Amino acid sequence: MESDIDRLMTAFKNRQLGRRTFLGSLAALAVTGCSSDDSSDTSDGSTEATLPQTGPPIPVQTINHMTLSVSDPAASLAWYQGLFGMPIAARQAETVVLQVGDGPQFIALGGAASDNPRITHLCLALDNFDHERIVQILAENGVAATGQSGPMQSRVRMRGEDFGGAPTGTPELYFGDPDGVVLQLQDSSYCGGAGLLGEDCLAIPEPAPGEGLLAVSEFNHFTIFVSDQQRSMELYQRLFGLEVDTYQGALPVLRVGSGKQFLALAGVPGVSTGLIHHASLAVGDFDVDRIFSLLEGYGLTVLGEAPGANGPLQAYVSMRGPNRGGAPEGTPELYFTDPDGILIQLQDVRYCGGNGYFGEECGTVENPTGRNG
C-alpha cells in the first residue's frame, strides 16, 4: 500500500500539488506522527485524522455537467438543440458546451467522432474549488495522483487558451472511482468557459436555431452501474458526505446538495467496469402522453410501457411501483435514447427519486422512505 508521503511525492512530481501545499502537507503528516512506511496506513487505507474536519472533505453542492462522446458531433449538436433549444455557452476548441437551464450546468458534446458513444464522465461542483487541496484529499483517501483517471487515480488537466481556458490554464480535476467511472470536480461557478475557475462563458450565449420542444431546467440525477455497491457507497459518502434520505426498494438515493439532485449507485453482478447508465434531466409540465407525442413527432419510436430500449431513437416509460419505492399506481419514469443510443431520463422538476406520482415524496436521513422490508 502506497504511504501518505509517497502519495504526496507522486502528486508533487506530477505538478498536481504546488510547493506550498506540498510542504504544508508534509508538516501536517509530521505533526500527526504519520510515518513514511506502510505501518502508518489505517485498516481502510484512509488518513482522515491528518486534517481536522467538521464536514465531508469534499462538500459537493450540485451536479455541474456531463460530457457525451458521440459518433457525429455536428448531427448530435443539431439534434439536442432541436429537442431542447439549448444555447451554446462556451466552446473548448471543437467541444461544444450546451447550457442547461440558466446555467452554469451544461452538456458538453465532444468534438471528435467516436466509435464508442457514451457518457464519458459526470461533474460535481463545490464552493471554493482548490485543485491542489482536492488532489491531496483524494490521495489521503486512496486515490493516487498518477496523472491518469483510471480506477482510484486522479489527474489535473490545465485547459489553456487553445481549448477555451485561461492563459495560464484552467485546472480541471478528474478521478476514477473503484470501477473506473470518471468523475470531474470543479467550482460551483464552472460553466465550461475561460477563467481560472472556468467561470467565464459567453456574456450572451449563442442561441439555438429554434426554441426546442422541451425546456430542461437542470440535471436531476445519474444512475451508475458498479460491481460492489457497498464499496462504492463507502467512498462516495466518505469523500462527499452524500446522505441517504430515500430508497427505491433496495437502491439507495445519495442526495447531492440540498435540492432534488442525487446519484444512484446500482450494484450489478458481473459488471467488470463501471458504467454511467443514464442521466436524468428535469422538465416542467411533466406529462407522459405530451412528451411521447413531442418525441414521436421528432422522429422517435414510442414503445409505451417497456423494460427498456433496444436501439437508438426510442422512448418508453417504466412504472415504478411500491416494491421500488414508487406510488401505488406507479411512478412514471420516462426514458429515451439519442441518435447514438445514449440513454436519457426525463422527470418532473419536483422529482427527488421518491414516492408519489411525480416521485416528489422523499424522506429524511433519520426517516428515509421507500426501503423494502
What are these regions (language model features)?
Residues 98, 107, 124, 175, ...:
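Fold-core signature of tandem repeat domains
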Residues 35-43:
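Bacterial lipoprotein signal-peptidase II cleavage site
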Residues 4-13, 48-74, 119-122, 188-233, ...:
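N-terminal beta-strand motif that seeds the catalytic metal site of vicinal oxygen chelate
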Residues 1-17, 27-31:
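N-terminal secretory signal peptides
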Residues 14-20, 177, 338:
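Twin-arginine (Tat) signal peptide motif
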Residues 110, 166, 186-191, 266, ...:
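Short beta->alpha transition motifs characteristic of CBS
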Residues 58, 68-107, 223-266:
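Core segments of cupin and vicinal oxygen chelate
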Residues 71-75, 122-179, 226-230, 279-343, ...:
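Vicinal oxygen chelate
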